[in-house]
């Protein structure tokens, strides 16, 4: 069985972060492992608390994973401090990690920065050059490329700028900012559009985590990058189309929409 590792924060509501990553990886047919960067207290209405692990403990988690069940792919989500980012980069180099998918979580949809400038600098210098593919949304791509993105042409220019600078592939996600579900993959000097169905579902908590984890899962299964993106987009469309409605705010998707067997059935009252 192929294996995948997620390095990210825990979401107590289960919709994003480590929990979304593990659900996604299992649903995409790989064995999921995790190294937790932080615990969060949150639900569908917001985050009320964050407790980071120490760099030493994060390193210990990664040592235990890589020396026993070596991951065929690695997904990296939100890491909020430069010390943690540096520790991750050091361990990925030490163990010669492969198929590294970086979701550079830096900016909220509102435009507010989620991590410090010091952490962003560490992300740029340590982690991004190690990536197989980056999966920024529009605000994140604007930060990395140093330009505003208001059109598909801007997405192409930004992805090329980022990919050329960090020597990796870039999947620039359209999403809500451009009011479509079309994503741009830039790599090796060329680009390809992946067109998706826009699904009118307000419950989109964890979509970025889910997409990057699905890509990592498919890379672990030896699909090439184009195929991995295509399959990941199809999976996330299914999870959104299942129209799960939980919580008082922007709720989670149904990551297990395709899993149906005798163990998933609810009890029927006679």
Annotate each language-model stretch with its function.
Residues 29-33, 192, 218-232:
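Phosphate-handling active-site elements
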Residues 14-30:
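N-terminal basic/disordered segments at the start of proteins
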Residues 2-6, 26-109:
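Conserved N-terminal subdomain of the carbohydrate kinase-like
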Residues 117-191:
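Conserved phosphate/ATP/ADP-binding segment of small-molecule kinases
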Residues 7-13, 191-205:
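Short pre-catalytic strand/loop immediately N-terminal to key active-site residues, enriched for Gly-Thr
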């Amino acid at each position: 069985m192929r294996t995948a590792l997620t390095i990210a924060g825990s979401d107590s509501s289960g919709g994003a972060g480590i929990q979304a990553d593990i659900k996604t990886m299992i649903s995409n047919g790989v064995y999921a492992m995790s190294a937790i960067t932080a615990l969060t207290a949150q639900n569908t209405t917001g985050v009320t608390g964050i407790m980071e692990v120490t760099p030493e403990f994060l390193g210990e988690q990664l040592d235990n994973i890589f020396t026993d069940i070596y991951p065929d792919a690695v997904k990296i989500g939100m890491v909020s401090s430069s010390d943690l980012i540096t520790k991750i980069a050091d361990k990925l180099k030490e163990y010669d990690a492969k198929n590294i998918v970086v979701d550079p979580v830096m900016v909220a949809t509102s435009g507010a920065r989620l991590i410090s400038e010091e952490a962003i600098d560490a992300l740029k210098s340590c982690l991004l050059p190690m990536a197989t593919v980056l999966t920024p949304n529009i605000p994140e791509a604007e930060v990395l490329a140093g330009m505003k993105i208001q059109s598909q042409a801007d997405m192409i220019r930004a992805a090329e700028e980022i990919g050329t600078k960090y020597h990796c592939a870039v999947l620039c996600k359209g999403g809500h900012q451009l009011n479509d579900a079309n994503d741009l993959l830039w790599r090796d000097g060329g680009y390809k559009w992946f067109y998706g169905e826009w699904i009118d579902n307000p419950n989109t908590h964890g979509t970025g985590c889910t997409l990057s984890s699905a890509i990592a899962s498919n890379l672990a299964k030896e699909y090439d990058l184009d195929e991995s993106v295509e399959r990941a987009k199809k999976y996330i469309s299914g999870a959104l189309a299942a129209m799960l409605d939980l919580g008082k705010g922007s709720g989670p998707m149904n990551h297990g929409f395709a899993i149906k067997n005798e163990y998933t059935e609810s009890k029927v009252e006679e």
